[in-house]
Swiss-Prot record:
Compartment(s) of residence: Cytoplasm
Catalytic reaction equation(s): 1-(5-phospho-beta-D-ribosyl)-5'-AMP + H2O = 1-(5-phospho-beta-D-ribosyl)-5-[(5-phospho-beta-D-ribosylamino)methylideneamino]imidazole-4-carboxamide
PANTHER family: HISTIDINE BIOSYNTHESIS BIFUNCTIONAL PROTEIN, HISTIDINE BIOSYNTHESIS BIFUNCTIONAL PROTEIN HIS7
Keywords tagged on the record: Amino-acid biosynthesis, Cytoplasm, Histidine biosynthesis, Hydrolase, Magnesium, Metal-binding, Zinc
Species annotation: Azotobacter chroococcum mcd 1
Cellular compartments per GO CC: cytoplasm
Protein name: Phosphoribosyl-AMP cyclohydrolase
Free-text remark on how the cofactor is bound: Binds 1 Mg(2+) ion per subunit.
Binding site for Mg(2+): 77, 79, 81
Free-text function comment from the UniProt entry: Catalyzes the hydrolysis of the adenine ring of phosphoribosyl-AMP.
Amino acid sequence: MKDWLDEIHWNADGLVPAIAQDHKTGRILMMAWMNRESLALTVRENRAIYWSRSRGKLWRKGEESGHLQKVHEVRLDCDADVIVLQVEQLGGIACHTGRESCFYRVFEDGAWKVVEPILKDPDAIYHAGHRHE
């Protein structure tokens, strides 16, 4: 029997993009990367665990900020190369900038315009020197 993780088309680095989506509203909250271990742990623990490429280690979303993502459903796209996590974003903040979503800029009139407010000052969320969860 084929392992469910083997059905995923991992990139050359053994990663797959993962989109976190609010399970009630459908709003896209963020995009991060997952490897086999992080996806297996996410399914086992029902909380989002990603792979941090910059730190080269597992990234348990919310372990520094308290803004955990409780996973309600895991979906795989038709090409088996993108994951969607339907999550409950605890604390209402997914972005390390203190916003609800990492997608807070809109392209208008030839420039990127910030359209989402900062809900909480990142300095009040993170320990010194640890901004990008």
